[in-house]
Amino acid sequence: MTISIKSFLIVSESCTKKLNLEKLTLIIVQVLLYYEEMKGAYVMCGFVGCMTDVEKNNESNCKDKIKEMNDMIVHRGPDDEGYFEDKNITMGFRRLSIIDLEGGHQPLSYDNGRYWMTFNGEIYNYIELRQSLIEDGYEFKTDSDSEVILGMYAKYKEKCLVYFRGMFGFVIWDKQEETLFCARDQFGIKPFY
């Protein structure tokens, strides 16, 4: 199993102990800030996840803890919630819808479930990137910029980051390779916590 991190990612021992997650090797909690000008209030989106060194997440109680953590951030993403679970990884997501309100449910999968992603942010040049992928034969199922990220990752792997213009943070799990790729925009507008 490989973990590739293209970001500042802090894994907290104290967080692990507070959540009583045994054999936990990685917790990812991303909290993202979005200012809603009309209401004058801060609305936040986020995703949570854990990766264990146990083959089955249920042995480490990871799924229950991710549900609990995701419930704690409901105020940050009131429009939708979603979960993904594989051998030793669980992801949870809370969404504030901006683009493709119906098609942007996450975690989002690609390539018959090989890749799974949670994403928050905005890719400003996603229309150009989408067109490039269409020219390469990719057929989109949604209008979401999230799906563009997955298509670019499938095509370019870690090098996909050089193509993105915007503010973003995401995590992609490759079921086939059993790798976790974490990234955020180069300025840290959408940081990992």
Which positions does each model-derived feature cover?
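Accessible peptide chain termini
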Residues: 1-2, 44
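Low-acidity, Ser/Thr- and Arg-rich intrinsically disordered low-complexity segments
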Residues: 2-8, 12-15
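Compositionally biased, low-complexity intrinsically disordered regions
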Residues: 5-6, 23-26
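Exposed, low-complexity/repetitive linear segments and helix-based recognition motifs
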Residues: 10, 19, 33-34, 142
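A periodicity- and composition-biased signal for non-globular, repetitive helical segments
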Residues: 12, 23-24, 36
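Polybasic, lysine-rich low-complexity intrinsically disordered segments
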Residues: 17-23
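Short, Lys/Arg-enriched N-terminal segments with co-localized hydrophobic residues
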Residues: 27-43
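N-terminus-centric sequence/structural signature that marks the extreme N-terminus
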Residues: 39-193
